[in-house]
UniProtKB/Swiss-Prot annotation:
Belongs to the CUE1 family. Residues 39-59, 121-153 have a biased composition (Low complexity). It comes from the Eukaryota. This is Coupling of ubiquitin conjugation to ER degradation protein 1. The keyword Repeat does not apply.
Amino acid sequence: MADQSFTLFIILAIAGYIAVKWFLSNNEQHPSIQINGFSSQSDSATASGTAASSNAASRQTRRRIRRRVNDDMIEVVQSLAPHLHPEQIRYDLEQTGSVETTVERYLSGRDMPFPPDYVPESETGGNSSNGQNQSTGSSVTTGNNTNNNSTSTDPRKRSNIKADNLLKKFNVDPQEDLSNLNPNDLSIEERKRLMVWQARKSMELKVENSEYLQSLLK
């Protein structure tokens, strides 16, 4: 009797072990578990891709950001530098974001380039006129004159107004001390005068510290 009970216990233990193993094996291969695992992996990959795309887009946006420029800013700079083309002023203001900085760059002799994609209207007209003159064969001289006219009207070839002319225009004495003036207490004309004086002083300081600039003034 004892042998039969022991044998029955062994059989039940083996059967229970097999049943548990079979149950666990089925759970691992169950389609719902596989789908859930795949979904979580897919969601994780999608989130990573979205984050990477967002970072790349934000970096690209930062590179393309240009400071906003309105007509009032351009008008103020052009009143101080009337020989500058509005597109030159706009392009520089987009980089500096400051009227004062742009004026200082101009008065200190910095080059004020046009936007890379800018094409003056006179240049297109000059090229077409040159083609017509050459096709008639009657006028190499006329073609040259047209070229010279288009060059003189091309705003990129105009000589910039000198800083000394601005001193006269706004009645600014370089020897006068305006450092104690508060721009907030001044009128628009007085602010322009102060800006010219500040730019002149800044330029003088740069010339004093640069042998290259000193050589250009000799």
